[in-house]
């Protein structure tokens, strides 16, 4: 698969730029860290070559200078807010993040509870952290926030917050999710630092939108697609244009809040170090795109994937999706047509040839497309998976990798003992059967060794797949899209 992004250059440039920003201030920088730190798969999809843990690796280059402060809102603790990608509550995710940071050698200094309320759930969480040896600090609700700047930047505002004691020049402020109070925590710390005579600084690190590529570049449009539920809109930064006469891309929320943030800087430090919200950022990703065409194509595919996901989510939930209108607009802006990708065309062609039965297609790294159809032994996704492995291994498509004799006992187990009504093998089941066959069958072993080559391949199904198949395909690193159609449309209940 072609690379469009130089990851090594990114790690070097990004860490160096943050060091330079630390040096601009009194050797103390509060860095608001947005987006996913450990597993930024969106970035790896739209910038081929970007590693999902690149931001973590960049921080590790600064680990002797850095400490982590994790922020969580008391309101999210009380409401037991759940992080959608992990399915765990925000308070548990704080513990997960602490383990993850410490596990790679990063120093976690403390946890800050924002919007503090002395509710039992909040106090219990605070006690739990203290019992684990994690220091906690409390920041409180400020009446009139964020518009009453004079009150906020005073002893009645930030002054009431506890000062978070930190030890290192770079303080990374991160959180389980948006709306936790990262920026407010940074600005509160600046207020207290200046009171103590330390001329600390603030910066913001977010990968998207990329400020120094065109507004309607597919990479930036793909970011809008990823945040369609938040209704974020990329815009030309008017403050940057006025200050420098140059265009830069930012998004609506940062642009809207900048006058308020700028006024806070002036009250805290006497003068704002920044002329625009873009100035506050430290993102160097745009400088590390080495093949623009590759990144454009990858981003166009991501927009299509986001659209199909929204269609399927709407089908599964039964609720109208407001995201779809935004995504349709983005499809038009990117000049995309649903149904034009080879995996869509060929999966539908197979389905039509088999009387409308479910079908699937996978596009391999060299551009070749292999398909799979529904049969008595295998579902379409499982069939496509085996055919892809055969193609990659140079095995004849007519050769059986797993014999019927090996599959039939598994079907008997499923239907006679495990209560399944579907005898066909799911993707995880056929892979287990293939690995068992590989012990005595060199052809099967050869096919099994190709699994890693499926990472990054696009796959399309003419029906919504089960959660078992979806999870397996995701774990293989493939990019799956499904038509918003159930295999049995007339049924009222559909197991996921």
Tell what function each PLM region has.
Residues 182, 359-361:
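Transmembrane alpha-helical segments and their cytosolic interface motifs
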Residues 185:
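Hydrophobic positions on the alpha1 helix immediately C-terminal to the Walker A/P-loop
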Residues 177-178:
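The conserved Walker
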Residues 377-393:
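A short, polar/charged loop-to-alpha-helix boundary motif
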Residues 373-374:
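Short clusters of small/polar residues that mark proteolytic maturation junctions
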Residues 391-423:
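Short HxH-centered metal-ligating active-site micro-motif
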Residues 1-173, 189-350, 354-357, 364-366, ...:
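Flexible phosphate-sensing "switch/lid" loops adjacent to ATP/NTP-binding sites
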């Amino acid at each position: 698969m072609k690379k469009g992004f130089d990851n090594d250059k990114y790690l070097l440039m990004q860490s160096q730029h943050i060091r330079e920003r630390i040096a601009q201030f009194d050797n103390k920088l509060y860095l608001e860290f947005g987006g996913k730190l450990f597993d930024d798969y969106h970035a790896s999809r739209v910038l081929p070559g970007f590693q999902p843990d690149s931001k973590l690796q960049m921080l590790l280059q600064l680990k002797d200078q850095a400490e982590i402060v994790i922020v969580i809102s008391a309101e999210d603790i009380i409401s037991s807010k759940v992080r959608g990608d992990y399915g765990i509550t925000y308070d548990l995710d704080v513990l997960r993040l602490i383990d993850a940071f410490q596990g790679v050698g990063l120093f976690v200094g403390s946890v800050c509870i924002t919007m503090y309320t002395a509710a039992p759930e909040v106090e219990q969480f605070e006690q739990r952290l203290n019992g684990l040896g994690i220091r906690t600090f409390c920041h409180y609700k400020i009446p009139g926030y964020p518009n009453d700047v004079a009150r906020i930047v005073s002893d009645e505002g930030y002054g009431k917050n506890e000062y978070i004691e930190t030890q290192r020049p770079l303080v990374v402020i991160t959180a389980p999710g948006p709306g936790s109070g990262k920026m407010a925590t940074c600005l509160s710390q600046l207020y207290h630092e200046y009171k103590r005579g330390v001329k600390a600084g603030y910066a913001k690190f977010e990968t998207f939108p990329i400020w120094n590529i065109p507004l309607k570049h597919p990479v930036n449009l793909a970011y809008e697609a990823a945040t369609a539920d938040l209704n974020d809109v990329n815009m030309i930064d008017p403050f940057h244009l006025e200050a420098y006469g140059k265009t830069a891309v930012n998004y609506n929320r940062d642009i809207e809040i900048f006058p308020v943030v700028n006024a806070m800087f002036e009250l805290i430090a006497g003068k704002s170090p920044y002329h625009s919200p873009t100035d506050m950022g430290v993102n160097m990703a745009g400088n590390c795109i080495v093949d623009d065409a590759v990144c454009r194509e990858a981003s166009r595919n991501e927009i299509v994937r986001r659209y199909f996901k929204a269609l399927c989510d709407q089908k599964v939930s039964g609720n109208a999706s407001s995201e779809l209108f935004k995504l349709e607009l983005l499809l038009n802006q990117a000049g995309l047509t649903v149904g034009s990708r080879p995996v869509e065309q060929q999966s539908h062609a197979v389905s039509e040839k088999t009387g409308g039965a479910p079908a699937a297609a996978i596009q391999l790294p060299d551009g070749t497309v292999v398909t799979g159809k529904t049969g008595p032994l295998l579902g379409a996704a499982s069939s496509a998976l085996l055919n892809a492995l055969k193609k990659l291994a140079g095995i004849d498509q007519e050769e059986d990798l797993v014999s019927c004799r090996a599959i039939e006992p598994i079907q008997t187990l499923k239907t006679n003992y495990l209560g399944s009504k579907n005898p066909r093998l799911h993707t995880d089941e056929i892979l287990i059967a293939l690995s068992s066959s590989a012990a005595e069958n060199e052809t099967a072993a050869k096919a099994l060794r190709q699994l890693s080559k499926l990472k990054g391949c696009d796959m399309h199904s003419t029906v919504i797949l089960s959660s078992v198949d979806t999870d397996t395909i995701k774990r293989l690193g493939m990019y799956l899209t499904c038509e918003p159609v159930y295999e049995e449309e007339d049924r009222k209940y559909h197991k996921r």
